[in-house]
Design a protein with these regions (language model features):
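Conserved HGGG/HGGXW glycine-rich cap/lid loop of the alpha/beta-hydrolase fold
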Residues: 15-69
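Active-site loop/oxyanion-hole signature of alpha/beta-hydrolase fold enzymes
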Residues: 59-99
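Gly/Ala-rich beta-loop-alpha elbow adjacent to hydrolase catalytic centers
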Residues: 100, 104, 108
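Flexible "cap/lid" loop of the alpha/beta hydrolase fold
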Residues: 109, 113, 119-149
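Short beta-strand/loop motif that positions the catalytic acidic residue
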Residues: 210, 216-218
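Acidic catalytic loop of the alpha/beta-hydrolase fold
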Residues: 221-225
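Catalytic histidine-centered segment of alpha/beta-hydrolase-like enzymes
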Residues: 247-260
C-alpha cells in the first residue's frame, strides 16, 4: 500500500513549512502540488486520493497559510521558488513533476522557467499568465481580494456559484463543506502576502522559452480564470497540450475522478 501520508514541519532558510508526502513507488517521478491562494495542502486531498498510488505526492503550505507560520517579511515568486527548491533538497528530491493550480500555477510557471533542473514535466490547472491575462469580471476580482470565503461558510455558500462556476452552481454546499472541512486558513496577513507575491508578475514574456512538456487544464465554466487564458498558454508554450473539462475553477477537487487519470497519463507517458 502507498496511501500513508507523512505530515511534518521542516525548516528551509529559517522558515518553517508544513509538508505532506504520500510515498509512491520507485521508478516514478514524484509530483509536487502547489495550491491556490488561501488554501492549505489539505484542500487537494480528493485529487491525491484519485491519483495512482504509485505516484509519490509532495504538498506544502506556503508561508502564512495553513500550518506554515507567517514569514518575517513579504515574499515574491522568485523568493518562494528558492524556498521550494530548498524544501525539495531538504526532502531529498532532485527533480520532480510540478502541478500548480490557480495562484499556484503562476508559481509553477516561474519555477519551471527559472529553476528548470527541478522540474521534469509541468501541469497548469485553472491558471493564467498573471498581470497580463484575460481577467475575471470586476465583481469576481472584488471577492478574491479578501479571505472571507474561508472564514464564513454561509458567505461561501452564497457566492460559490458565481465565484467558482461548474458544479458549485448546482451544489454550493459541497464546495463549502470541502473548503471548510479541510482548509486551514492562516492569518489575514498571510493571504495578503500571497496576493502581493504575484502583484505585477506576468509569465507572458518567458512562456515561449519554457521547454518542459506541459499539460494545460481548464474548465469550460471558470469565472475566476476564463478559458481563454488556457488557450493562450497552450499557444505560447512550445511543447504543450490543452485539456478542457466540463466544470469550474475547483474542478481538480470536484471532478478529481475525471482529472486525476488525465494528469497521471500525461506524467507516465514516455
Amino acid at each position: 500500500m502507498f496511501s500513508t501520508v507523512e505530515v511534518r514541519s521542516i525548516a528551509v532558510g529559517g522558515q518553517q513549512l508544513r509538508v505532506a508526502v504520500r510515498p509512491g513507488r520507485r521508478g516514478r517521478v514524484p509530483l509536487l502540488l502547489i495550491n491556490g491562494i488561501g488554501a492549505s495542502l489539505d484542500l487537494l486531498q480528493p485529487f491525491v486520493d484519485e491519483l495512482a498510488p504509485s505516484v509519490e505526492v509532495i504538498r506544502f503550505d506556503v508561508p502564512g497559510v495553513g500550518g506554515s507560520p507567517l514569514p518575517v517579511v513579504p515574499y515574491r515568486f522568485t523568493g518562494l521558488c528558492r524556498m521550494i527548491s530548498g524544501m525539495l533538497s531538504e526532502l531529498g528530491y532532485a527533480s520532480v513533476d510540478v502541478l500548480g493550480i490557480s495562484w499556484g500555477g503562476g508559481v509553477a510557471q516561474h519555477l519551471a522557467v527559472f529553476q528548470p533542473s527541478r522540474c521534469r514535466r509541468l501541469v497548469l490547472v485553472s491558471t493564467g499568465t498573471g498581470a497580463l491575462m484575460v481577467p475575471a469580471s470586476p465583481a469576481i476580482l472584488a471577492r478574491m481580494i479578501t479571505p472571507r470565503r474561508y472564514l464564513d461558510r454561509r458567505y461561501l455558500e452564497r457566492i460559490a456559484p458565481i465565484l467558482y462556476g461548474g458544479s458549485a452552481r448546482t451544489d454550493p454546499q459541497r464546495v463549502a463543506s470541502t473548503m471548510h472541512d479541510v482548509s486551514r486558513l492562516g492569518s489575514g496577513r498571510g493571504y495578503l502576502y500571497q496576493l502581493a507575491a504575484g502583484t505585477g508578475w506576468t509569465s507572458l514574456p518567458f512562456l515561449p522559452l519554457l521547454r518542459k512538456p506541459t499539460l494545460v487544464m481548464s474548465g469550460d465554466d471558470d469565472p475566476i480564470i476564463p478559458l481563454a487564458n488556457a488557450r493562450l498558454m497552450n499557444w505560447l508554450i512550445p511543447d504543450s497540450r490543452l485539456y478542457v473539462y466540463h466544470g469550474g475553477h475547483l474542478g481538480l477537487v470536484t471532478e478529481a475522478a475525471e482529472l486525476a487519470p488525465v494528469v497521471d497519463s500525461f506524467l507516465a507517458a514516455p
